[in-house]
Amino acid sequence: MREPDFLNHFLKKGYFKKHAKAVLALSGGLDSMFLFKVLSTYQKELEIELILAHVNHKQRIESDWEEKELRKLAAEAELPIYISNFSGEFSEARARNFRYDFFQEVMKKTGATALVTAHHADDQVETIFMRLIRGTRLRYLSGIKEKQVVGEIEIIRPFLHFQKKDFPSIFHFEDTSNQENHYFRNRIRNSYLPELEKENPRFRDAILGIGNEILDYDLAIAELSNNINVEDLQQLFSYSESTQRVLLQTYLNRFPDLNLTKAQFAEVQQILKFKSQYRHPIKNGYELIKEYQQFQICKISPQADEKEDELVLHYQNQVAYQGYLFSFGLPLEGELIQQIPVSRETSIHIRHRKTGDVLIKNGHRKKLRRLFIDLKIPMEKRNSALIIEQFGEIVSILGIATNNLSKKTKNDIMNTVLYIEKIDR
């Protein structure tokens, strides 16, 4: 295919119709380098201002040289380029999160509203097959979205209908680690798919067909259920349990960055069935609110806010509260800093005790009232004790007791730290 053919496809799809500035995720591989060539050549026709963003993962000897070459390329094209270096222990998941956090920073800094990536049909096949092996929910087997709105930005993948063989051989960097089978995606690409294609030469097309069919079903269900108010539990529970699950999953599609696991989805179902009133964070900055026969899922405000008896602290925020400085994911320096492992996926609640509070320690549930009696905690200290809560469970009673955090809590691994420092009131 020729470059004008790709331009015509982009124009027909109207990828950039709503955008004046776009950030291109430039890895240096063939797919992203060719996308760079098309977008930079046809900026005028597409009516966009192009901005480049590259992450140097520091995993190969060549990576620093490649970074220099990309800087030269950007200078020759008279385009701005932003570069960040990955540090710390490497994993596919950590690298992916690092990249997208960086891309969002660049977009915020430049005022861009579109993030463009060079994912293509071969990536789509690998992604769907990986998710199938991992046992993911059916809706995710539709694969990578061609266009995806996340908050105030749109991720655009204009090559998703093309295979890598459709791209001309142009100057690019070859990542030799792609030939190694250390990572799951590489094993899919290098071993599993070639073996399965021996059984069915059109196996890749079959996988893409399944993904498209699931997407059709998903869109059809959303259209057919448009007049059903899922948030009205009386209406939701009037259907069979199978239909309830499908309607609830369709409702959750409104929140693309929520991404509940099967276990978390089942937990939400149980809350809706058996809790009369409920309000707690669930995941990724969302909270579930239930009041008798009504419920809703909504984003928590990004700022920490202090209520009458409770404070809500969000990831990468700090707040001083009742003689302590609480820092969620931002390290504090000092000799007397208390550290509590927590999850960054949802907010932390800091409050005083309530009737019926329970602490889970070493797998056993114990009422706070009994714990305070056993530890002979004075009444004044019981009333002033600060409770740290996440996922609806007590993580710690500050200065008194801490939950057993060596296990997964609410299906989410403890992946950051709450730092606490005693300060003067």
Swiss-Prot record:
SMART domains: TilS_C (SM00977). GO terms for cellular component: cytoplasm. Its main location: cytoplasm. It catalyses: cytidine(34) in tRNA(Ile2) + L-lysine + ATP = lysidine(34) in tRNA(Ile2) + AMP + diphosphate + H(+). GO terms for biological process: tRNA modification. One of its GO terms (molecular function) is ATP binding. Gene3D superfamilies: HUPs. Signal peptide: none annotated. Its EC number is 6.3.4.19. Belongs to the tRNA(Ile)-lysidine synthase family. Ligates lysine onto the cytidine present at position 34 of the AUA codon-specific tRNA(Ile) that contains the anticodon CAU, in an ATP-dependent manner. Cytidine is converted to lysidine, thus changing the amino acid specificity of the tRNA from methionine to isoleucine. This is tRNA(Ile)-lysidine synthase.
